[in-house]
Structure formats: structure tokens, C-alpha cells
């Protein structure tokens, strides 16, 4: 049984603890996949399909593993990133939320949610009416993990966090799987509000994610965010450095802030089921 992560430890020690916990999670996932998919050995497949080169066989095997992963509905469960017992502030990250997970967040007092995959209309806006009417969805936009977040989004996120800290609110953000877009934003939060360095933030992002090698641009993006936090010029170019854009093109209000409540503008007929 894993011990809960101690919040009183320095950030470096907490990161090391999280990496060990993430490795346990990886091993559990590998065992689950091994039980869900039975793959024949390469030699057997090569005999049946002698025309297939080795890389095709590897791709077939990988595709089978991915199919098993999707079938298991694998997404990161809600995880507390930071909290302040004195004020009541808390921040959670997650993958796509089930009804039970959303209900648990509500029970813990989460008041506002930022959705990074643009899927709130078909999920949270529907589920909130059933079990958690007090939670507000402040942002709902499909960010692209292959492109850097904008300066306007970061400014809106900073304002959201600072208001939440000042008022002692509990906040959460999610993407679809909880590894890439949510991982990048967590890295930014840790550097901006917890004093972590880029290397430390990247280590935790990688430790808590799966299929991170498929998104090699995330590490240099986080390094660029670290330069921004440190007040240094971004040296990575437009591919990784946050750029200034029209706020509305990033799902923000024209004033460059998060909306009051995305779901308030959705009727039953507008909800995608």
C-alpha cells in the first residue's frame, strides 16, 4: 500500500516521492495491459506473415497495446497539485472526469473547473445539472499540446489562481487524459507559484504521464515557460515560446479573462450527448 504524499516535504523531496509513485502506477498499468491483451511472439507472427518487416510487426503490437489502453478508459484520476490549509485554497489536476470523480471533487469543495480539451459541453455541463450545480466551468477550449500556450491564456490562468488563493477557493483543471496538456500546465504552475525550476517541473511532468515520448515538444515548451517565469527572453523560437494572440481565438473572453460560467450558456438541446 502506498503512503500518501506528504505536503510538508520540500518540493524536491515531494517530486522524488511522486516519481516513485508514478513508477508503481506504470507497473500496475503494464500488468493490466498484459492481462487485457495477448500478443503472439514475433517469431510466430513472422511465420504467418513473412512479408511483414520488423517495424510493421512492432507497430501492430503497439497498436494492440494502445487499443487495450483506450478500452480500459485510462485517464489520470484527480490529483491535488497544491493546497493551503490556512486559507482553504487547493488546486487539482485530472484527466477526463467520470461522474463519480466529478462528484468527489464537488464533495471536496471544488468550485471552479478549467477544461483544456474543449469537451465540457458534452460532459461537465451535463453532469453538473445532475449532481454538482454549484461548480462553474470557467474555460472550455481544445488546446493543442504540440503548440505553446499563449501569453493571454497564461495571464488569465495567473489571474484565476491568484484570485483563488486570495479567496481560499478550490480549483481544478483537466484535459482528456490528464498527462500532456494538464501536465504542461502543472509544470507552469509549479514554476510560477511553487518556486520549482524547469528541470524539476519537467521531471514530474514526465513521471506522471504516459506516452510522453510522442510529445517531445513538451519539454522545450516547459523550458520556455521557465524562462518566462524567470523574466528571461525566450530563446526557443515561436515553436515553443508563448505568443500573443487574439484572446477569443484561445477560448477567452474579449477582455482576456476566463468566462464566468461556460455551462450557463448551454441548454439541454445544446449539450452534445
Q: What are the language-model segments listed below?
A:
Residues 175:
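Short cysteine clusters
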Residues 39, 43, 62-63:
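Short terminal hydrophobic/aromatic SLiMs and anchors at protein ends
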Residues 178:
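Substrate/cofactor-recognition hotspot
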Residues 2-10, 14, 18-29, 33, ...:
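Cys-dependent protein tyrosine phosphatase-like superfamily
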